[in-house]
Amino acid sequence: MVVSVGTSLVVQAITAPPAVPQLVIYKERPPLMQVNAKEVARELLTHEQFKCFSFIMGKESAWQDKDNPTSTASGVGQLLDGTYRNLGMKRSSSTVAQTIAALAYIGRKYGAGGPCAAKAFWLKNSYY
């Protein structure tokens, strides 16, 4: 709005009222230890990405919390102790935490290609 006052103009800024925050209702979730690692991955990924990720986890550990007897690799994603450290994470006995760590590793290593790029690499090299 422009108001003329004598020979000068005064501009008044008209601002919208503050936005009312939207109420967001989240699904009720069971405690973390009761959540299935596959379901967490399925919620975080597209259908195609989940299929690729599930292929890798199936090959690495059959989605089980396993320790590799010949290296420091452990968990669903068979990540090395050094990989956990590089991700700023700690080794966990939770398959959900292991799955999130594997997704973080894939995101860092393969970027936008994600789990399907990791699967393509796995098919050529038998590791990701």
Q: Model features per residue range: what roles?
A:
Residues 90-97:
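A short, structured beta-strand-centered segment in the mid-to-C-terminal lobe
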Residues 21-62:
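Export/targeting segments at the very N-terminus of extracytoplasmic proteins
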Residues 114:
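Acidic/aromatic-lined carbohydrate-recognition and catalytic surfaces
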Residues 61-64, 83-86, 127:
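Solvent-exposed loop/turn segments at secondary-structure junctions
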Residues 1-31:
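N-terminal prepro-regions of secreted/extracellular proteins
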Residues 70-87:
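Substrate-binding/active-site groove segments that recognize
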Residues 48-63, 99-106, 117-123:
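Short, functionally critical alpha-helical segments immediately adjacent to catalytic or ligand/cofactor-binding
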Residues 109-111, 121-128:
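Catalytic cores of secreted/periplasmic lytic hydrolases that degrade extracellular macromolecules
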